[in-house]
C-alpha cells in the first residue's frame, strides 16, 4: 500500500517529526515539546504540546491519537480523553491530553515519545430516521450480553 501524504508544520524548533518505530507499526510516535521535565502526579491531568500541526489529505481521513501501551500499563499514563480525534479541518497544534492513573508520579522528559498518531479513513454517514431496525442475533443485548 502506498503511503498517503500528511503535511506537517513545525511550530516549535524542538519538535520531532512523527516517526514509525518499526516497519510494521500502525501509528507514528508523537514527542513532547517541553521546556523542562514535567512531573504528573497520580490522577493529575496535563496537556502535552508536540510543537506540530498537520494537514490531513482530505475530509475522508482522521488522525487518531492513542496512548503508548508501555506507558499505560507500566506507569498508568493514559490519554485523558481515551482517544484523541484530530479532524481533517483542524490546523492547530497537536496537543496530547494525558492523565496519570498510576499510584506514583511519572515524569515526562522533553522529547519523550508520549503518544501514537494513527491516520485512518472516515466514512461520512447520512443518518436516516427509521421506525424499525433490522433484526440481528444479538438484538438489543449489550454490556456483557455476548458472554466472557
Briefly describe each language-model feature range.
Residues 1-148:
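DUTPase catalytic domain/fold
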Amino acid at each position: 500500500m502506498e503511503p498517503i501524504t500528511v503535511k506537517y508544520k513545525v511550530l516549535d524548533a524542538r519538535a520531532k517529526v512523527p516517526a514509525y518505530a518499526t516497519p510494521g507499526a500502525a501509528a507514528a510516535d508523537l514527542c513532547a515539546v517541553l521546556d523542562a521535565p514535567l512531573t504528573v502526579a497520580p490522577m493529575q491531568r496535563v496537556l502535552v504540546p508536540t510543537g506540530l500541526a498537520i494537514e490531513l489529505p482530505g475530509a475522508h481521513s482522521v488522525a487518531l491519537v492513542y496512548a503508548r501501551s508501555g506507558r499505560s500499563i507500566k506507569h498508568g499514563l493514559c490519554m485523558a480523553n481515551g482517544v484523541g480525534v484530530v479532524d481533517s479541518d483542524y490546523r492547530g497544534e497537536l496537543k496530547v491530553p494525558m492523565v496519570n492513573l498510576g499510584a506514583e508520579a511519572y515524569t515526562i522528559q522533553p522529547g519523550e515519545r508520549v503518544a501514537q498518531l494513527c491516520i485512518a479513513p472516515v466514512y461520512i454517514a447520512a443518518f436516516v430516521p427509521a421506525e424499525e431496525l433490522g433484526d440481528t442475533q444479538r438484538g438489543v443485548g449489550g454490556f456483557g450480553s455476548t458472554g466472557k
